[in-house]
Amino acid sequence: MQYKTAEFFSSIHTSILENALSGSHLIKNIEAKLIISIVDTLIRYYLEIPEGLTFDDVLIIPTRSHIISRSQTDLRTRLSRNIFLNIPLISANMDTITESGMAIALAREGGIGIIHRFMTIADQVDEVLRVKRSESVMIEQPYTISRKMNVAAAVQMMTDREVSGLLVEDEDNKLVGIITRRDITFESNSEKKVSESMSKDVITARQGITIEEAKEILHKHRIEKLPVVDTKYHIVGLITSKDIIKMEQYPYASKDKKGRLLVGAAVGVKGDFLERTETLLDAGADVIVVDIAHGHSDNAINAVKMIKKAFPSCELIAGNVATGDGSKDLIQAGVDAVKVGVGSGSICITRVITGSGVPQITAVIDSAKVTRDYNIPMISDGGIRTSGDATKALAAGASSVMVGSLFGGTDESPGKTIVKNGKKFKMYRGMASFYASLGRKYREESSQLIESDDLNDYVPEGVEAMVNYKGSVVDIIRQVVGGIRSGLSYCGAKTVIEMQKNAKFIKITSAGYTESLPHDVDVV
């Protein structure tokens, strides 16, 4: 838009100059010089300062569609070079948005959650394991307990691991029984041995059993847990009726090759990031996200190179950047996907504090020119308030969108519910906010005294806020997905890639935006 405007002013410039030189009586030379000076200034302005657009500045022009029903659309998309999602939604790696609860809920719907890094390595690994163990074709390395332990230990382990039963093994790691909460409910003697309370006649299956065969055994014997053992009766895995039911209940869930839910985890660019990456990958994290506010920096680029060198097969996402040049540098460093967005989040004040950033639609379009050439997926991160925003980001070139505030305040987001003036709220904060940074500093320097000067020197680029309690995130996910599907149908597209080929944007005025909202009525 800015270049067409400049060309227009340039044509006026030429016309005025020709008239002045030819002695036209339409205008006097002195008037021509004044107008030329003004036009020159406008040309310089439009050539040197490009225009930046965000979601509210544009609409997608509807086109002819052969889509009969939005159910015909397919939202399958690439998260990274080799990982696919069934819906293009990612929950943000923020400490008030994504831990295991959010990651499980989103993966079951077809997306993925990125576990935030603002915790110890052990705690972050535990969150990843919770997602991986939440459901699978067969639970590998199921939780076990020695038959010599007491009932109190069994209860504690079930509580800590959030499971309803444990496999019991002997000194040779052979299966000898199974103990469930049902076996020890109302047990008055907590010192009683597990071997005395467990069920000893355990129905088992051999390695290689199919799901259909497992369903038959579970039904025939009216049991809920089916241990899988080898020829020497060593425990290989565990198949549960709950997992099979979940497979049928969530047919579009995002899963790995072992049938476990997909989950990602964030790391930084300093300190323990290599150790953290290795431990998270060992725990089963499907993708690692290098998490830094200014991704177009030597710190981020060097971290990407180091991670890729140490773990070549790791699926690696990095960001955040706001330009095509930033995306190109990260891709050349070795990333498998680029995360785009600087200052677009609802609790981010980077643009206000630093004066830096690019409006999100422009940032996505500029980055898409590069990521498309390299065939690398791009994630639009920040500013998603509605399904329409998500649709625009995808149409502009993103393969998926990362969501923060929209998922905040839900049952699955971390943190306690706050009641204020009779209304329910949950905390939501930017990871560059003062208290988030203070908490991070305490964790990183727990053995050292934090000087007040260190805190005074810190300039927050995020804020803390309360958001209305919203209930389950599943309802929000399905509303957003439904809106995106409708957006595809308005573009005459069955897939996200088709929409990107078909989509044409139109810039709107503030009046056009107002017209897009409910108006001249009292909304009930």
Give a label for each model feature.
Residues N86-L89, M138, K257-A265, A310-A322, ...:
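Short beta-strand/loop segments at the ligand-binding rim of alpha/beta enzyme cores
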Residues L59-T73, M119, A265-V267, V287-H296, ...:
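Glycine/Thr-rich beta-alpha phosphate-binding loop at enzyme active sites
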